[in-house]
Every structure is written in structure tokens, then in C-alpha cells.
């Protein structure tokens, strides 16, 4: 097992958790692209925080628990994790699907949280049933997905250079991502009516070129959370931790220090 990675058993699940760095605790919830794409940014965060970064069950080759079938299962798993670690004044940082997860945690219980940061989060549906608020990344071909995810599509991983093992992990990540987010697609229709319960300072960080959930979506999200602030990151798409990591880091540090 790599340094800094431990296994914590919760709900009968052997949860892999990275715990590295010193400073205020920061719980990092990765997006649907899997934990591996967040590792470089995670390492930068460890220079300033005690980072706690679980791998969502089903990602990175881990099994999906038999009793898991919705994102809500992750919500209660991570509420249990916060209790088990007995951490307080936590900065909760979530990316994309992980941002939705972070918002769901915060509407239930903020007693262990100090601040909430949502990076290009999904989770709400501003429009009606017939409105496509969130791009369908599961149906689109790879080149189209790259254009949705990246300001510069050439930054997208080249599948032709991946090993069979890497492709296997990618496929299992995709299955887990779909299981957590497919029905209803990438949102909880009740979340918008609960966001007023968030009582900690909240920052939304958004790539200016996000093709999955555009800026208009971010503005609606911001307006639903009391006192929330939205900061737009230029030359970044849905994954600013990959395209503009230093800019993203500075915004996280500035907000956490307030």
C-alpha cells in the first residue's frame, strides 16, 4: 500500500483513505474521473493541509458494496468517516460528482465543517424535465467528451497510450460513476430545496469553459446557497485541477484562510 494510504472499515466496507500533510483538515472528494487524476493537486494541498482523501467504493479497482446503489450511500459513508476520524473545522472540497456529494453532506450536517468548496459541481437541475442542464458524457464519443471537459481538448488523456490495466481501471471507474449518477442523471431533484440548510461559508470555483455544467448553471447553484461566492477560472473546463492547478490552489488557500 502506498505511503499515506490506510484502510478504514466502515459499514463493513474497507475504505481506502489517503491521509497526508499537516495543517487544518481538508476532506477531498474526487470526481467521476477517479482519484488518480487528482493526485498531483492532492500533493500540492498536502503542503498546506492535512488532506483526507477517500477513494469512492467502485473506483480505482475497488469493489462496489452490495448495499450501494445511489450517491446517498456515499453521503452517509463519509459522514461516518468524519465521525470515525473525529476531525473538526474541516474544509470540505469536492470536484464535479464529488462536489455534489459535498453539498449533500453539508445539507445534512455541518457540525464538523468549517468551509465548503465546490469545484464544477453537479447535483442540481435548474430547468424543467425537458431541459438538458448537464451534458451527457456517457453517450458522447471520446472527442466530444474531451471538448466538454477541457478548455484545451489536447489535455485529455490519450486512451491509445494506456496499458490494459489502466483501461480496466478506467472502465470500472465509468461503471461506478454511472451507478452513482445515472438515475436521475447527475442530480438529486430534492437538493435544490435543501441547499438553504448550508450554514458554513461556501465557495464555488468554476472553469470558464466548462461544457458539462456551464457558468449559468454555476450561478443558479451559487444563488441557492446562502452567502455563497462564485469565482470563475479562466482557460479551464470541467477539470480545473488538471488545467489550472496553481490558480485553483491559490483560490482554495485564500478562502480557507479567511
Predicted segments, located by residue:
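Flexible "cap/lid" loop of the alpha/beta hydrolase fold
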Residues: 100-108, 113-144
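Conserved alpha/beta-hydrolase catalytic His-Asp/Glu region
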Residues: 127-133, 139-199
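Short beta-strand/loop motif that positions the catalytic acidic residue
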Residues: 198, 204-206
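Acidic catalytic loop of the alpha/beta-hydrolase fold
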Residues: 209-213
Amino acid at each position: 500500500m502506498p505511503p499515506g494510504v490506510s484502510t478504514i472499515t466502515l459499514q463493513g466496507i474497507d475504505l481506502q483513505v489517503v491521509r497526508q500533510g499537516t495543517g487544518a483538515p481538508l476532506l477531498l472528494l474526487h470526481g467521476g474521473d477517479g482519484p488518480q487524476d487528482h493526485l498531483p493537486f492532492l500533493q500540492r494541498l498536502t503542503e498546506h493541509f492535512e488532506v483526507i482523501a477517500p477513494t469512492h467504493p467502485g473506483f480505482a479497482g475497488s469493489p462496489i458494496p452490495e448495499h450501494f446503489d445511489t450517491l446517498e450511500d456515499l453521503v452517509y459513508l463519509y459522514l461516518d468517516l468524519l465521525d470515525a476520524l473525529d476531525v473538526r473545522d474541516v474544509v470540505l472540497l469536492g470536484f464535479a460528482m464529488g462536489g455534489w456529494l459535498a453539498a449533500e453532506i453539508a445539507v445534512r450536517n455541518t457540525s464538523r465543517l468549517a468551509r465548503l468548496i465546490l469545484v464544477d459541481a453537479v447535483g442540481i437541475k435548474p430547468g424543467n424535465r425537458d431541459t438538458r442542464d448537464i451534458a451527457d458524457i456517457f453517450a458522447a464519443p471520446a472527442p466530444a467528451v474531451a471538448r466538454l471537459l477541457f478548455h484545451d481538448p489536447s489535455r485529455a488523456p490519450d486512451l491509445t497510450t494506456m496499458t490494459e490495466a489502466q483501461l480496466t481501471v478506467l472502465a470500472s471507474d465509468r461503471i461506478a460513476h454511472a451507478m452513482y449518477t445515472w438515475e436521475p442523471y447527475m442530480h438529486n431533484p430534492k437538493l435544490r430545496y435543501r441547499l438553504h440548510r448550508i450554514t458554513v461559508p461556501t465557495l464555488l470555483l468554476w472553469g470558464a469553459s466548462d461544457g458539462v455544467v456551464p457558468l449559468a448553471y454555476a450561478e443558479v447553484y451559487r444563488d441557492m446557497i446562502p452567502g455563497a461566492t462564485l469565482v470563475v477560472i479562466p482557460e479551464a473546463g470541467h477539470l480545473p485541477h488538471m488545467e489550472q492547478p496553481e490558480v485553483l490552489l491559490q483560490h482554495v488557500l485564500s478562502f480557507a484562510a479567511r
